């Protein structure tokens, strides 16, 4: 079975438990953060040590299953 990678956009909730955590906490399970948008400023291929903030927009790349897991974790 061929893996079908795709992109997904996730908006981190304002009061997210993930705010203050580095992107590397998301960049496992086959997920790559391809962009981060904060206050209208887009950063392509952000560094793994970039700290997430509430209302960040993350563009994730990975398989559908990996993206589902990452989105559930981010929206907690």
Can you say where each PLM-predicted feature lies in the sequence?
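Cytosolic Rossmann-like ligand/nucleotide-binding regulatory domains
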Residues: 9-76
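Anionic-ligand-binding alpha/beta catalytic cores of soluble enzymes and soluble regulatory domains
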Residues: 1-3, 7
